[in-house]
Every structure is written in structure tokens, then in C-alpha cells.
Design a protein with these regions (language model features):
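Catalytic core of nucleotidyl cyclases, primarily class III adenylyl/guanylyl cyclases
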Residues: 29
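DNA-dependent DNA polymerase catalytic subunits
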Residues: 1-23, 32-180
Length: 180
């Protein structure tokens, strides 16, 4: 996982590893794999569902720790004795791709404690209405395969086959244009 390129010193000291993968207005995403590997030496032997359950346990513990710290934050930083700040674990994601702010894809395996198998894509170019549908469907399928752990050779083969298909004389050129 590639982490944020530059991190303020007060979040992560220089030389320390920053496990924060993505942050926006109301969300924080962290690479929990190093912590899971540290806590569970048999991590590689666990099946995916067991890994998700262990991750959820850790996320819920940190959720409570952070929520408890919000009382101190409210009192000391905002001079507010009573507050409604709360940290909430919304979902467990097995893998994700973060391109930039509000442009990402994530494979959600648990949402608010309920088992899911959901691909959540936000803001990526191929999802836009003016993007040729033939490319949108292809990019969506490649992204899903990448997030679900397909081997590089499998993805490379699909890319080459798609290129061959797009370059063939049998393809109607109008499907390559923008729909608007």
C-alpha cells in the first residue's frame, strides 16, 4: 500500500511509518495489515472472513478509544463540557484504490457489522456519463479484479485482449466515442 506522500510532523514523526492511507472530511482509512500481522502471527493461515473479523475487532476497540478521547478534545480544544462527538466504524474494506480526494474505489466486506461483498466506486473518470461505456465497463471489471487480488498476468492478458478487440475491424467505431 502506498501511503500519503507528505505528513505533518504532529501526525507522524519523521522516520516513523505512517499507516494512514486516505483521509477526507469525515473518514479515515488505515492500513491495518501490519498491526494484524503483529497481533496474529498466524495471520497468513487465516481465511479472509477470519481476517475481516479480526480487523473489525481492532477497529471497534480504536473506535471506543477515540470516542473517549473526544471528551478531552471537546473540553481542552473547544471549551465545550458536553459534546456529541463520536467515532464510528462504518465499514471493513479488504482492499482499496485511492487516486485523490473523492476519487477512490474500495471493496467492502462488512458494512456496519453486516457482511457485504460490495464494490464502492466514487469519482473515478470511467464512471462519468461522458465516458465511453465500452471503456467504462472494461475499466470497472479490471478494477474489480485488481481489488479482489487477481494476478498481474491475468490483468495483463485481459488488457491485451481488450486492446485487440478495440483495434479490430469488426468493432463499430461509434462505441468508442463519447456518449454526449
Amino acid at each position: 500500500m502506498i501511503n500519503l506522500e507528505s505528513t505533518p510532523w504532529f501526525i507522524c514523526k519523521e522516520g516513523d511509518t505512517n499507516y494512514c492511507a486516505y483521509v477526507d472530511t469525515d473518514s479515515n482509512y488505515y492500513n491495518a495489515e501490519p498491526l494484524l500481522r503483529h497481533l496474529y502471527p498466524n495471520f497468513d493461515d487465516m481465511d479472509e472472513e477470519e481476517r475481516d473479523n479480526k480487523l473489525e475487532e481492532i477497529a471497534l476497540k480504536y473506535q471506543d478509544l477515540i470516542t473517549n478521547h473526544y471528551t478531552t478534545l471537546a473540553q481542552e480544544a473547544f471549551n465545550v463540557p458536553v459534546h456529541r462527538f463520536e467515532m464510528k466504524t462504518e465499514c471493513i474494506i479488504r482492499s482499496a484504490y485511492f487516486r485523490s480526494t473523492r476519487r477512490y474505489a474500495q471493496w467492502i466486506t462488512k458494512k456496519e457489522g453486516v457482511i457485504k461483498n460490495e464494490l464502492d466506486i466514487k469519482g473515478l473518470e470511467f464512471m462519468k456519463a461522458n465516458f465511453p461505456p465500452i471503456f467504462g465497463k472494461f475499466f470497472n471489471s479490471i478494477l474489480e479484479k485488481a481489488l479482489k487480488g487477481a494476478k498481474q498476468t491475468e490483468i495483463d492478458d485481459l488488457l491485451l485482449k481488450f486492446r485487440e478487440y478495440v483495434m479490430s475491424k469488426d468493432l463499430d467505431l461509434t462505441v468508442l466515442g463519447n456518449p454526449t
